[in-house]
Amino acid sequence: MSGTLRTVRRPWAIAALVVAVVSLGACSSDDDGGAAALTWYINPDNGGQKTLAAECSEASDGAYRITTQILPNEADSQREQLVRRLAAGDTSVDLMSLDPPFVAEFANAGYLMPVTDEQDVAALTEGVLDGPMETATWDGELVATPFWANTQLLWYRKSVAQAAGVDPTAEDFTWDRMIDAAESQEKRIGVQGRRYEGYMVWINALVASGGGEIIRDTEAGVDAIPSMASPAGDAAADVVGGLARSPAAPGDMATAGEEEARSLFQSDSGSFMVNWPYVYGAASSAVDDGSLDASVFEDIGWARYPRIDAGRASAPPLGGINLAVGAFSEHQDEALDAVKCITSVENNAQYMVEAGNPAARSAAYDDPAVREAFPMADLIRESIDEAAPRPITPYYGDVSTSVQRTWHPSTSVRAPSTPERTDTYMSEVLHGERLL
């Protein structure tokens, strides 16, 4: 990730951006018989958001018409494009699909419309799971609505676990036991070790599972306190560095993302993997198209994210997408109504089945179609509800990049030196003493 909003508040930059987007106002004109023309900036998916846009437009009975604009694939590139538009006061940004870690940054800059009406707040938050709800507020106000949420599960090959004599579904199953089990069977563990946001997701989950925080007192802005140098940070470093230097580490750990981990897990070397629920549907589709043997799919089991300490429940990763209304939209009332439609329980369930992205509202997991598509629906719901968000700070980009740079490559990670180095590095970045 490239810095924070501090880099886009310079008058010369904003002036240039205004010129670049001055012609976009027409995108929000009412040109459909009085219907408000809304533009929804979406992250790439399989077309599910475009479908919801059409269905909610139809259901509005002429009140609004939603057009979607696709953002880049990478989260940091999505952020960059939205920042450029919003810094220029672009009125075409009526709705945006926003990665949860960026909500605080955007809200702090005044780019998101706060929801203040009590009835609106109730409609947008009723039944939303606790994990994603933590990411939707800033400074005591609701500034975004969880659209879909995500979490990582522990995926395991039943045959490997049985041969190693371990039960990954046991409440006290830890990273150490998992590494030992994989080593005993000469197998490899799939993780996300590339220097990117997925690596930050893993590290944050480990620190949170140990009862710690990467940074605390985030409401203090640049004066927040980096707190990796702690028992929880040391325990996280022991897991990351210990796995990286063990025989259970994949050969491509330093460059592995979600797909590399999935490929390893489905191979003869696979044993355990932490990854998002999409991997289950991907494996099923691979069987259907003949690229994966059915016996491999039948060998896949799932459990809650592994523990750091046998006596402390894990804090699974939290991902997903929040919806926010642009602060400069000329159709904020209609945009808010559209958010209510898009994030309804019914549409949460539909999107989970069709796009494979888990719902943010608890009731969606009781939908028969969801339960058929996701046999582990209850576990996903529990994991999202008890997940730990990444640091909620307007300077998230600086925080995440500081962690990624000081913890990579994973073979170099050791306690207590790595967490201590991270705290120093992060503090220098936040106070402008070091450039990213």
Residue ranges and their predicted role:
Residues 278-296, 308-406:
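C-terminal lobe and pocket-closing loops
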Residues 100-151, 209, 297, 301-303, ...:
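Hinge/lid segment of periplasmic solute-binding proteins
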Residues 180-183, 221-254, 301, 305:
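Glycine-centered hinge/linker elements that transmit conformational signals in sensory
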Residues 83-85, 92-94, 124-160, 311-315, ...:
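A structural signal for short loop-to-beta-strand junctions that line the ligand-binding cleft
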Residues 2-104, 121, 428-436:
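Conserved N-terminal structural module of periplasmic/extracytoplasmic solute-binding proteins
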Residues 117-128, 171, 193, 212-235, ...:
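Short, solvent-exposed loop/beta-turn-alpha elements that line the ligand-binding surface or hinge
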Residues 143-147, 152, 176-229:
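Extracytoplasmic/periplasmic solute-binding protein
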Residues 162, 382-436:
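Conserved C-terminal helix/tail region of periplasmic/extracytoplasmic solute-binding proteins
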